[in-house]
Amino acid sequence: MAAMAVGGAGGSRVSSGRDLNCVPEIADTLGAVAKQGFDFLCMPVFHPRFKREFIQEPAKNRPGPQTRSDLLLSGRDWNTLIVGKLSPWIRPDSKVEKIRRNSEAAMLQELNFGAYLGLPAFLLPLNQEDNTNLARVLTNHIHTGHHSSMFWMRVPLVAPEDLRDDIIENAPTTHTEEYSGEEKTWMWWHNFRTLCDYSKRIAVALEIGADLPSNHVIDRWLGEPIKAAILPTSIFLTNKKGFPVLSKMHQRLIFRLLKLEVQFIITGTNHHSEKEFCSYLQYLEYLSQNRPPPNAYELFAKGYEDYLQSPLQPLMDNLESQTYEVFEKDPIKYSQYQQAIYKCLLDRVPEEEKDTNVQVLMVLGAGRGPLVNASLRAAKQADRRIKLYAVEKNPNAVVTLENWQFEEWGSQVTVVSSDMREWVAPEKADIIVSELLGSFADNELSPECLDGAQHFLKDDGVSIPGEYTSFLAPISSSKLYNEVRACREKDRDPEAQFEMPYVVRLHNFHQLSAPQPCFTFSHPNRDPMIDNNRYCTLEFPVEVNTVLHGFAGYFETVLYQDITLSIRPETHSPGMFSWFPILFPIKQPITVREGQTICVRFWRCSNSKKVWYEWAVTAPVCSAIHNPTGRSYTIGL
């Protein structure tokens, strides 16, 4: 009946629903709504004014059907086109016991009937501070049924009483809630989802009013599992031609919600009576088509958003051909390497020596040869002579290198099939070039590899890269917390999945504070006793009430002088997609109050066979130390 169903957001068009409080003729209404261009209908499952009695006689045994027949629509239509709504009189957290008990029974009746119909989603209101019993009834329903419905909690972006203009300024108000103003509704949601133990089936339907809160409040909401945004017709303005439009601030919010692929629900009567109701939907389509186009990084990362991957271990494992292929497609990385090698060659070889001074350049971890090609291009660009060694431990990639040498490179390049730490070089290098960095800089063991290879670098030799630094930032993300929680493996400790890092394209998250530098490594390392173990303490000021779920890791590297690569958001190399950030989760979410400081301790540890990280939060409260002795995750040497 409709082109798209609930849960079908994606692609270029907007997925949208129409919210109605009363639907006398369901099939006719659904047809009319579909004709207007909407994909689904939000409607009460029972008549909103039909208060059932479950406790007292005689009303308890009132004869006749409780609601309309499921035969009015096909099973497929119930499954895809209808979102159920709870009757407005149901108040399971009422202080009046009779109302509470009756509401519990009515709520279960409506949820069970929704499950019987196979509804894809059910809308429930969160409109007060105490929703504890609502959470209990819903959790019990989720755990007892065999249905798969989603539950969308309808939460206002700004609490209704915050918009009252009848309150005299500075006069005391009667409400006694702990949180006021912009914080309030997020705290309702946060407490509710905590009571429901972060159930993946409970999401947010965010109701957007005419007044918007400050940016940090909006940022925080965008780290939540928002499945729908409810737009009342009353928030639309009118343009010169009489069509509904939104303010610039609202448009910016819609653009950000579109990135999260939320579905939009239009509620309320037509406030632009001379225009068709579908003009509200047409305006959303217009916004969708006119949003900023995705950049190269976003295009590359499409489909990988919030998808957890285990970090590569190229030292312990031999990479596959396709893995090399993906990294070789990066347009920025190799041009930066070429620029760094070019500058280095010009600095090391003066113009008058360009025909006699042959620089020995060693590519350590040559893979399938992209750095060898970048080096050859740099030498040609600089008009300097080089002699190249391509050192690679993966015997499969060596086949590719030998083919390159036979077909293209010739005697200028010597291919060496060996681990760089064990290779006995025939001569010392002027320049060593490597691409051994992971998302957290040193997590693919670049320090250990380059330290093991620097004995064949001349005393005045140069390493490209010369330095790299890892960065950490605290983040909040229900989505990522649930993704990590779902990674539990049968024969391992039940919390082992929280003691390992993940490479992930961060998407549905809120960064709580700016990234700070963690560990720095420099090459060549001239310390008499080389020790790559590290320990750091980082303190992050937090300016908003929130919840901590883990830490995002990034890195920056100086290839040579002013030539750099970075995945830190503030300095990210434009268009570079070789690395996604890394995520270090924590076992238990930690509530953080506005003005508090998050303190994290981070260790880099090692023994003769492996390297691992350990981490712990020590403020505002203490967590357990994660991954002690590398019990859940190590990187093999």
UniProtKB/Swiss-Prot annotation:
Q: Which domain of life is it from?
A: Eukaryota
Residues bearing N-acetylalanine are 2
Q: Where is it predominantly found?
A: cytoplasm
- Sorted alphabetically, which SUPFAM superfamilies does this protein's record hold? S-adenosyl-L-methionine-dependent methyltransferases
The subcellular location is: Cytoplasm; Nucleus; Chromosome; Golgi apparatus
Which biological processes are named by the entry's GO terms?
Answer: chromatin remodeling; circadian regulation of gene expression; DNA-templated transcription termination; endothelial cell activation; Golgi ribbon formation; liver regeneration; negative regulation of cell differentiation; negative regulation of gene expression via chromosomal CpG island methylation
Q: Describe its function.
A: Arginine methyltransferase that can both catalyze the formation of omega-N monomethylarginine (MMA) and symmetrical dimethylarginine (sDMA), with a preference for the formation of MMA. Specifically mediates the symmetrical dimethylation of arginine residues in the small nuclear ribonucleoproteins Sm D1 (SNRPD1) and Sm D3 (SNRPD3); such methylation being required for the assembly and biogenesis of snRNP core particles. Methylates SUPT5H and may regulate its transcriptional elongation properties. May methylate the N-terminal region of MBD2.
This protein's name: Protein arginine N-methyltransferase 5
Q: Which organism is it from?
A: Homo sapiens
